[in-house]
């Protein structure tokens, strides 16, 4: 990187040391914040009167040299009393609130369907939102060192999340990393006020914990509009418990041990449309996170689809619970494959992964 006048030319974002001392600089451009690999930044003996808040994004900075500049006394006091990282944190937390990101673009699935009336179009069209909300215990300053503390604070984030959910007015919300306490104390009562009902299960570890510890275990939450859909049944899928029941897994000790130790879950909702009478299955899953366990993620995805097939076949045989509108004829289902199924979640997978190939194509080669 080089400083030219008051402009910065970014050449190497992996730069670890930058010395711009004694250059008569009167300002540091905001682009300095792009050099997030900096561990040392020397700005001695310039003409700086302020430091840009973008220095706050330099979360790996261990040495900041600012002596010899006509800066505000409080900046010198912070670095003298508490050190470089305290000054970086101060600049990070005092940065102006950025412009909100653009609204998300919805993916519209225009199926090749026969012409429908306005009433039918309304009944058979719905919106689905899937969102990993990053639970409080994972949103640490160590993990997100470039983020202001006020933006990481759960009290701030949960209100933003709720506001965003309500603004989209979708028929289904599939949320991951929802702590048990936050589901029952915050999201469920708040979304109830907007006409939603929720399904929730935490990760399997919650069963062995005390009540106070259990409140901080995260899991999957699915919300649906109660004036549009009626919940018929719900199911918990615990991937490690399914693995325990699979004799073919026990034949391969390595995969059995790798899958059994991961307590990821999926929650399944079986619903019926109140007006049109059709059935729908909504699956909400959170797969294991570690990139080193790609095989485990693929096994979890396969178990999810296997369970959905079994549950779907059972659901197809159940008589309808709702009395649909006179303008609609409730469909009959020969098997679960005929029931519309939504598979949502955080799969911790990329488009070149076995999980993506399996879910998009129905199979994955053994050498993936």
Which residues fall in each region the model found?
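Structured beta-strand-rich core segments of catalytic domains in phosphoester-bond hydrolases
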Residues: 98-125, 172-293
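Short, small-residue-biased leader/transition segments that mark boundaries at the very start
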Residues: 2-10
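The feature encodes a structural signal of leucine-rich repeats
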Residues: 6-7, 28-31, 51-54, 75-77
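Acidic/histidine-rich helix-loop elements
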Residues: 134-155, 240-254, 258-259
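Metal-dependent phosphoesterases centered on the DNase I-like endonuclease/exonuclease/phosphatase
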Residues: 192-194, 292-368
């Amino acid at each position: 990187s080089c400083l030219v006048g008051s402009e910065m030319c970014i050449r190497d974002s992996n730069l670890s040391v930058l010395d711009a001392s004694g250059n008569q600089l009167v300002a540091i451009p905001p682009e300095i914040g792009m050099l997030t690999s900096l561990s040392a930044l020397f700005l001695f003996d310039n003409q700086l009167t302020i430091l840009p808040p973008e220095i706050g994004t330099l979360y790996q900075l261990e040495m900041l040299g600012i002596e010899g500049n006509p800066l505000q006394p409080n900046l010198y006091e912070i670095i003298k009393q508490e050190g470089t990282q305290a000054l970086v944190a101060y600049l990070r937390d005092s940065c102006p609130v950025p412009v909100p990101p653009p609204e998300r673009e919805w993916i519209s699935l225009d199926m090749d369907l026969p012409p429908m009336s306005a009433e039918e179009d309304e009944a058979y069209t719905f919106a689905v939102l899937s969102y990993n909300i990053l639970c409080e215990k994972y949103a640490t300053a160590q993990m997100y060192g470039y983020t202001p503390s006020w933006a990481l604070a759960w009290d701030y984030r949960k209100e933003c999340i709720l506001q965003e959910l309500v603004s989209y007015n979708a028929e289904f919300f599939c949320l991951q990393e929802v702590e048990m306490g936050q589901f029952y104390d915050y999201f469920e009562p708040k979304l109830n006020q907007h006409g939603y009902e929720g399904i929730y299960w935490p990760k399997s570890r919650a069963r062995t914990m005390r009540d106070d510890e259990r409140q901080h275990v995260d899991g999957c939450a699915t919300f649906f509009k109660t004036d549009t859909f009626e919940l018929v049944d719900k199911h918990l899928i615990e991937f490690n418990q399914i693995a325990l029941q699979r004799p073919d897994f026990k034949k391969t000790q390595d995969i059995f041990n790798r899958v059994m130790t991961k307590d990821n879950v999926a929650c399944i909702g079986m619903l019926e449309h109140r007006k049109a009478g059709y059935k729908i299955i909504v699956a909400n899953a959170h797969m294991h996170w570690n990139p080193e366990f790609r095989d485990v993620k693929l096994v979890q995805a396969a178990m999810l689809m296997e369970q959905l097939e079994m549950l779907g076949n059972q659901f197809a045989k159940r008589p309808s619970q709702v009395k649909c509108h006179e303008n609609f004829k409730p469909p009959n289902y020969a098997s679960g494959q005929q029931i519309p199924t939504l598979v949502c979640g955080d799969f911790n997978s990329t488009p070149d992964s076995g999980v993506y190939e399996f879910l998009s194509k129905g199979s994955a080669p053994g050498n993936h």
